[in-house]
Amino acid sequence: MSDKDKNKEEQQKRQLSDLDSDLVKKIKEKYQLIKKKCGSHSPGASIVEKEIPEVNLNIDCCFLSNPYATEIFEKRLKAAIKNEQWLYGQIESYPAQNAQIAEYVAKAIGIKSENIFIGNGATEIISDLLNRFVKGNILIMLPTFSPFYEYVNKETTEIHYYPLVKDKNRFYCDIDRLLIYCQVNDINNIVVINPNNPDGSLIDKESMKDFLQRFSFMDNILLDETFIEYAPQESMDSVFYEYKNITIIRSMSKIFGISGIRAGYCITNEKYVKDLLENGFLWNSNCFAIYFFGLLNDEEFMKDYKEAKDKYMKEIEEFEKQLENCNPKLKFYKSTANIFLGEILDKDKNAEDLMYYMLIAHGIYIRDCGDKKGLNEKYFRISCRKSEDNKKIIEALKLYQ
C-alpha cells in the first residue's frame, strides 16, 4: 500500500478533533474566502482542490450528476477528437446556430424545433426567460434553486416566496392552498421544479396535469425538469401543446454528467424562441455541446445511456436505504431524485460543522444548505455517487459525532 493510500485509509477514521487545530482553522479560512466569491453556489471541487491543497478531496457529493453517464460521453468524445481534421474544423469554424441544434433535440423528443431554444446550460435559459418575458408578480416555492430568484428583474417583477409544506419525512406542494394564495395576490408567473432541488420532492404526473389546468390563467409557468429522469414518471412535454403558458426547462448536466460543456434546452412558445434568436443567442453553444446534442439521435449512445441510468437508479435506491438509519443525529427527507436533503438533529451542531467534518476528515464534499432561502443552518444536501464511493460516504456519516 502506497503512502497516499495509507493516508486516505487513515482519513476515513478521523474526527476533526483528531487533526491539528491550526490546520483545521487554516482550511476553514481558505474555504470561506473562496465561498464568498461564489455567492449562493458552492465552490466547485476543482477550485477547492486548487485553492486548498491541504484537503485530500476524494468524493464530490455537491456534484449532482450520473457518473456512469459521464463515462459514456467521454468515450465517444475521445474517439471523435482522434480525428484531427474534425477537431481542427470544430475549433476554427463557427458552431452550428441555435435553430440548427434545436432540430437535433426536436427529432429526439418529438417536439417541433420552432418550440425549442438551446441554452448554454439551464442556468442561462432561466436568466433569459426571467429577464425577457416575466413581468408582474412571480411565485417561487421554497426551498428552491437559487437562480430562479437571483435572476429576476427586480425593476419589473415582484417575488413572492411560498414555502413548501414539510411533514415528518418529506416536503410537498399543497396545490389547493397555493392556488388560493396566487389568486389573492395576483400572481401571474410561477416556478415549479419537479422533482424539486434541493429536496427531491415530486408532484406526480396526474397532479401535475391538474396543476397545469388550474393554473392556466398564469402568464408563465416555468417548469424545471432537470431531475425528471430520476423520477418514477415521464416529462410533461407530452402535454406541452395543450397549454399556451408553459415553458419546460431541461438541463443535460445532471442526467448525462456533462456540466463542463454547458448544455440545456427549453420547450416554449414560438414567440419566445423567435425573440431570443433575434436578440443575440444565435451561437451560444460550443462545439462539444453540439456534438453531444447530435448523440441524442444515436441509437447506440442512447442504449448505453439507458444502461448507465438503470445501473445508477439501483444505486440511488440502495443509497437512500443506507442513509435512513446511518446516524441518529441526522435525518434525511424522502426524495425522487439522486439528491437527498438532510437535517442535523443535534441542537449543538449545524450543517457547516458536518460539511467541514466530511471535507477535512474524510475528503468528502457535501453541500451546506444554510444559505438557501427557505432552509436554515441545520440543512445540508448530499448526492448519490458510485457504489464504492457511497459506502465511504455512509461510513463517514456513521462516524459523525
Model-derived features: where do they sit?
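Conserved PLP-binding catalytic core of the aspartate aminotransferase-like
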Residues: 313, 326-361, 384
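Conserved PLP-binding active-site segment of the aspartate aminotransferase-like
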Residues: 62, 268, 341-348, 361-399
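Short loop-beta-helix segment that forms the pyridoxal 5′-phosphate
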Residues: 94-95, 106-128
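PLP-dependent aminotransferase class I/II
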Residues: 97, 245-325, 331-333
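PLP-dependent aminotransferase-like
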Residues: 17, 27, 124, 131-192
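Active-site phosphate-binding strand-loop segment of PLP-dependent enzymes
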Residues: 169-231
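N-terminal "arm"/small-domain region of PLP-dependent enzymes with the aminotransferase-like
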Residues: 2-93, 107, 173, 185-186
